[in-house]
Amino acid sequence: MKMLFLDIVWPLYLADGSLIHRHELVSNLAKLENEIHIFTTDSSTLSHFDNIRCHYVHPGSLLTITSNYFRSSARLIGSETFDVLYTRNPNFGFLAGLFCRSRCKALVYELNGIPEDESNLIKSKSGEEKTLQKRRTGGISGYFSSAKSRLKILVLKKALGFSDKIIAVTPGIKANLESAYQIPGDKITVVPNGANTSLFRPLDQEECRKNLGLDLKSPYICFVGNLAPWQGVEYLVKAAPSILSRYPDCRFLIVGDGVMKNELISLSREFGIENRFVFTGVVPYDRVPVYINASNVCTAPFILARNAKIGLSPLKLYEYMACGKPVVASAINGVGDALEASKGGLSVPPENPGALAEAISELLENQDLRASMGSKSLSYVTENYSWYSVAKQVDKICKSGIKN
């Protein structure tokens, strides 16, 4: 099968979920004897795979990259045909549906969330909600803001309508597409995210701590991911004083960056515990397993907003488990049920610092329980959530959408 990924596959310098997803899916689809074409700003990206053809997009400003991308993609699609065009971007899906149907046998669209929900949550957390409310109440600026939102929804609806197959990463997203966008259920298949079980694997904890310059005796609690509003990291900060009252030497590793970082640092200062937190900022993807393996317990304290509506299939959960670590996470669809099925951790009510602190403390207190849950986590992810198994499902869906 000859596939073209319409989204730019950026160099994997960062531990960013969207970038990781693209790299892992592309590389594993190539292992299945598919010919994969990608656009990238770094010609070395995935070029070591025999079945991946890299099409270089000259970097620069956002406007420059966008212009170069459209020129490169128009030239490629104009000169070659493909079995499948694949995208996670509604704009690309919309344009492909309008202009590229004669150049492919199937158009496949993947959805990892509800874009307007994520956008609204980020704006509300960054203090823009009041401004948006004013715009909605009247005036020309309110009119254009509303028009922009309607246009985004229209583009997404068209992209979904043009698609031959749609992949949703959670059952909640599928249900939302059926009810809010009137997409037929038989057009949508749920395929969860996964973990790179070759990269994310158990490593010696002491060696990892030495590598990172961490204390060898203190217990460490780890969070990995984008510091976005829906991650709920503020509840881990709020839980920390209770944990520290029982385990004064405990430390907290916050691995990643995002719009909430400064707020989280300020919150730790308010509690007088900023010296117990390590905010690493951006970390290369291949270094993330070192931080996870240096830790005793890993966390995913997701909030209800956005997450309860669509459920979750979080990379961090599978990566924690692939490293053989016990997990404390919010009881949200896709997370709590994975912990229940695997017996690899404890689920707690979302947005509840007390329950979060109690569960983390329970694991810190019991080394045998941590070891048992970690072992079960590893087995569960290896059997069910490797990126290779995800790619096999995507491969089957794409081939089923091809029209001869």
Please provide the spans of the model-predicted regions.
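N-terminal subdomain of nucleotide-sugar transferases
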Residues: 1-45, 50-52, 80
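Conserved acidic donor-binding segment of nucleotide-sugar-dependent glycosyltransferases
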Residues: 341-342, 346-353, 362-368
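Acidic donor-binding loop of glycosyltransferase active sites
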Residues: 164, 276, 292-310, 325-326
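A short, well-ordered alpha-helix in the C-terminal region of glycosyltransferases
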Residues: 249, 355, 362, 369-383, ...
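Nucleotide-activated donor-binding/catalytic signature segment of Leloir-type glycosyltransferases, i.e.
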Residues: 255, 262-290, 294-297
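Carbohydrate-associated surface elements
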Residues: 172, 194
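Conserved donor-binding/catalytic core segment of Leloir-type glycosyltransferases
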Residues: 4-6, 215-240, 253
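Membrane-proximal helix-turn-helix segments that form the acceptor-binding/catalytic region
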Residues: 70-78, 94, 98-102, 109, ...
